[in-house]
UniProtKB/Swiss-Prot annotation:
GO terms for molecular function: structural constituent of ribosome. PANTHER family: LARGE RIBOSOMAL SUBUNIT PROTEIN ML63, MITOCHONDRIAL RIBOSOMAL PROTEIN 63. It comes from the Eukaryota. InterPro entries: Ribosomal_mL63. Keywords: Mitochondrion, Ribonucleoprotein, Ribosomal protein. Its main location: mitochondrion. This is Large ribosomal subunit protein mL63. Transmembrane segments: none annotated. The gene is Mrpl57. GO terms for biological process: mitochondrial translation; translation. It is found in: Mitochondrion. Identified only in the intact 55S subunit. It is unknown whether it belongs to the 28S or to the 39S subunit. May localize at the subunit interface and dissociate from the 55S mitoribosome during subunit separation. Belongs to the mitochondrion-specific ribosomal protein mL63 family.
């Protein structure tokens, strides 16, 4: 039993690249460099986003007119797909040739 434990000591059970007891992957130089580059980009984004271009008072309602125009354009595009209204008076207007009975 002790001999079996000694001989099978370093074995990864099951599939060696997936699972709970998997073999750890070595970190390459390229992976380190790409991670550093990604963290630098994230830090720069955080820096620029931490300083807003407009104050909260300026930002409040600055795009209301543009948003209203965009909504009107969307509404007009949606209503243009529908056919025009049809009225019964227009449909039966050809029957009003003569009104001798009235």
């Amino acid at each position: 039993m002790f001999l079996t434990a000694v001989l099978l000591r370093g074995r990864i059970p099951g599939r060696q690249w997936i699972g709970k007891h998997r073999r750890p992957r070595t970190v390459s130089f390229q992976a380190k460099e790409s991670m550093i580059r990604r963290l630098e980009v994230e830090a720069e984004n955080h820096y620029w986003l931490s300083m807003p271009y407009m104050t909260a008072e300026q930002e409040c309602g600055h795009a209301a007119e543009r948003r209203a125009q965009a909504f009107e354009a969307i509404k007009a595009a949606a209503t243009s797909k529908f056919p025009k209204h049809r009225y019964i008076a227009d449909q039966l207007d050809h029957l009003n040739i003569s009104k001798k009975w009235s």
